[in-house]
């Protein structure tokens, strides 16, 4: 078999996009969704593998700016739209695309690569580590009292058209991005994705709605939601399906939840993604009624170990020598001395004795502060070579806020 790995040409994009959908068992996108995907695609960063005239594998990358502990706007390549046709599985095409991408990211000076995974077990062998968790909520509003905080009555709530409120909602989101690791500065045009509302995507729910929360005339929070009607013998038991919820302060956040709790003909609220340190379980009397479930969301891979570790700050002072294994990107292998604190950091090559040993995958998992080095060591994935080196390094990698990816890509 002779195949060619290369960049996608403009005239090939529609076929490339259709092959992506086919690999995921989906129908080709209708025109409106296709236009949104095309606008979000960086064609110059989209690659594929061709067997003759047939596109048999796809992969793309997006030029993100990622918030990391102590810093916002760190360049990160967002790996996306990865597929291999079933006729060409287990022939090394995915490995070739991953290697090609990482070399390209390095050449572009992007110290990090990030992705979300439909099958997480695939990407560990390429150095991607689970770095953030999602908390999914199914809140039993029939048995829970709504949150109450002083000042909530000063918050004005208005139902508005989701598209008309886009600019106000995006300003709220943009103000939150620098504060939490894992959040991405949205690329131009991505706000349109947030309000797509095709009937075949609603899963039985009604139209997408938006409530904005104002204080003194300023929009300080919003929720996008739909109501899924459910009728049982005993009466209505609908579900409020929340797509997005952001707020700039605790009072506005509680006011939005009080609104969602009180929607008529419903008995629960479902929300697919919140950070694991979300306030809602602490705002209600019985957190068991919040139906919390966890799953990994964002995967991180240091492309250049030195640049990546120097791009963030550290919760406590750190001075440690790391022995890094990275057979997929051998330029990262070897010993690195990491020194840093809350004001900045450096990470340089060294010949000093290593104190901790780990792979680049573990560095990715620890990078945003979502998984402690001590926890990774307990799983046998980090080795303490100098007694006493692990605990202070683990504390230094921590984050005041849990990392969170609010949306996929």
Question: Can you name each region flagged by the protein language model?
Answer:
Residues 48, 54-63, 78, 83, ...:
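Conserved beta-strand in the GNAT
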Residues 98, 103-117, 264-275:
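Conserved GNAT acetyl-CoA-binding A-motif
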Residues 5-12, 20, 47-49, 92-94:
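Hydrophobic, small-residue-rich alpha-helical packing segments that form membrane-like cores
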Residues 2-14, 69, 149-409:
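Intrinsically disordered, low-complexity, positively biased terminal segments
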Residues 23-68, 182-210, 308:
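Active-site rim helix/loop that mediates acceptor-substrate recognition in acyltransferases
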Residues 79-103, 249-261:
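Conserved acetyl-CoA-binding loop-helix of GNAT-fold acetyltransferases
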Residues 107-111, 116-137, 255, 276-292:
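Conserved active-site alpha-helix within GNAT-family acetyltransferase domains
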Residues 139-147:
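Aromatic-anchored glycine-rich loop motif in surface-exposed flexible loops
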């Amino acid at each position: 078999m002779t195949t060619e790995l290369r960049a996608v040409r403009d005239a090939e994009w529609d076929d490339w996009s259709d092959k992506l959908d086919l690999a995921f068992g989906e129908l080709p996108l209708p025109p409106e969704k296709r236009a949104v995907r095309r606008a979000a695609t960086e064609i110059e960063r989209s690659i594929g593998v061709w067997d003759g005239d047939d596109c048999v594998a796809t992969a793309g990358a997006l030029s993100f700016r990622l918030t990391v502990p102590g810093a916002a706007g760190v360049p990160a390549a967002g790996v996306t739209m990865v597929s291999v046709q079933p006729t060409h599985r287990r022939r090394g095409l995915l490995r070739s695309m991953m290697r090609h991408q990482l070399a390209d990211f390095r050449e572009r000076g992007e110290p990090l690569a990030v992705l979300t995974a439909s099958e997480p077990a695939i990407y560990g062998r390429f150095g991607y580590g689970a770095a953030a968790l999602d908390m999914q909520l199914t809140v039993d509003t029939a048995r829970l009292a709504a949150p109450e905080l002083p000042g909530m009555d000063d918050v004005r709530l208005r139902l508005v058209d989701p598209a008309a409120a886009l600019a106000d909602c995006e300003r709220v989101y943009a103000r939150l991005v620098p504060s939490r690791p894992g959040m991405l500065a949205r690329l131009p045009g991505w706000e349109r994705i947030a309000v797509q509302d095709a009937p075949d995507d609603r899963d039985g729910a009604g139209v997408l709605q938006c409530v904005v929360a104002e204080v003194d005339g300023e929009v300080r929070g919003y929720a996008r939601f739909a109501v899924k009607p459910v009728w049982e013998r005993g009466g209505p038991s609908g579900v409020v399906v929340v797509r997005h919820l952001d707020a700039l302060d605790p009072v506005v956040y509680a006011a939005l939840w009080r609104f969602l709790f009180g929607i008529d003909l419903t008995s629960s609220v479902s929300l697919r993604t919140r950070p694991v340190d979300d306030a809602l379980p602490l705002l209600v009397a019985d957190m068991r009624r919040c139906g919390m479930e966890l799953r990994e969301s964002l995967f991180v891979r240091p492309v250049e170990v030195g640049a990546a570790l120097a791009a963030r700050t550290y919760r406590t002072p750190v001075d440690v020598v790391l022995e890094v294994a990275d057979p997929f990107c051998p330029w990262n292998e070897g010993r690195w001395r990491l020194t840093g604190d809350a004001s900045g950091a450096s990470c340089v090559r060294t010949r000093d004795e290593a104190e901790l040993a780990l792979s680049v995958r573990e560095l990715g998992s620890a990078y945003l502060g979502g998984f402690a080095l001590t926890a990774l060591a307990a799983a046998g994935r980090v080795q303490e070579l100098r007694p006493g080196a692990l605990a202070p390094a683990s504390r230094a990698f921590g984050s005041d806020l849990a990392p969170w990816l609010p949306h996929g890509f």
